[in-house]
From Swiss-Prot:
Residues 29-47, 61-71 have a biased composition (Polar residues). PANTHER family: CASEIN KINASE II SUBUNIT BETA (PTHR11740), CASEIN KINASE II SUBUNIT BETA-2 (PTHR11740:SF43). Residues 75-92 have a biased composition (Acidic residues). It comes from Arabidopsis thaliana. This is Casein kinase II subunit beta-2. One of its GO terms (molecular function) is protein kinase regulator activity. Plays a complex role in regulating the basal catalytic activity of the alpha subunit. The tetrameric holoenzyme CK2, composed of two alpha and two beta subunits, phosphorylates the transcription factor PIF1 after an exposure to light, resulting in a proteasome-dependent degradation of PIF1 and promotion of photomorphogenesis. CK2 phosphorylates translation initiation factors. May participate in the regulation of the initiation of translation. The gene is CKB2. Belongs to the casein kinase 2 subunit beta family.
Amino acid sequence: MYRERGMVGSKSEVVDRKRINEIHDNRPSHSMSQPVNGKGKVTSTSVLMGKQQLHDKESSRSGSISKTNISDAVDISDTDSEESEVSGSDGEDTSWISWFCNLRGNEFFCEVDDDYIQDDFNLCGLSHQVPYYDYALDLILDVESSHGEMFTEEQNELIESAAEMLYGMIHARFILTSKGLASMLDKYKNYDFGRCPRVYCCGQPCLPVGQSDIPRASTVKIYCPKCEDVYYPRSKYQGNIDGAYFGTTFPHLFLMTYGHLKPQKASQSYTQRVFGFKLHKP
């Protein structure tokens, strides 16, 4: 990197020197030897040539400055590329759980503690629901498997899908614990789950909910504590998440645990009118 920077600087200096030499070579030989008249004044021809020389000097200076700026810009771009490479290398140390939760569309997920996942009691019954269970669990915990090279590319994709499913099922259990509720509380305060689209709820923050605890039965929805209704998430990426990864219990247990966050039920409702007259409700 340092050698490349040195080369850029030397090239610009060589170009500048060539330009200066060309300017000197192109100067007329008689410009500096114009005769002075008897009154001791420089002739008009010599004045014009002097101005031309001054203009040539200024152009050579501006050319050298522009070349220097170009070399500086190359140095800056090299520095930026170094910083981007450093940031990329830092990202390689990210755990699988952090990587998964930071994926686009996975904003509803919180990071499950490794200690919780390593406790077999918390994973009871999941081995029969998730294919490639052991390999998926190793992938979640960043444990290198000795059989990784034996799998085909298709099998590796299946293991990755199984890891996402297993993490989702673990996540549904974790968010019902005190630690999990606290993690979801932070996301709730940051409006990570979105706001209620209903006008009279005035932007009430929502909570994720599943309509079934069985995987692949339905996608995740958002529950509004104010109007007590469920809605589709606004993001199409979040709309593809399995609702079983959050379960049917979470939002209600959350509001029971943090009762002070439960808002008053919305009192206003939309009134239907035709030409200003309210419609009669049968």
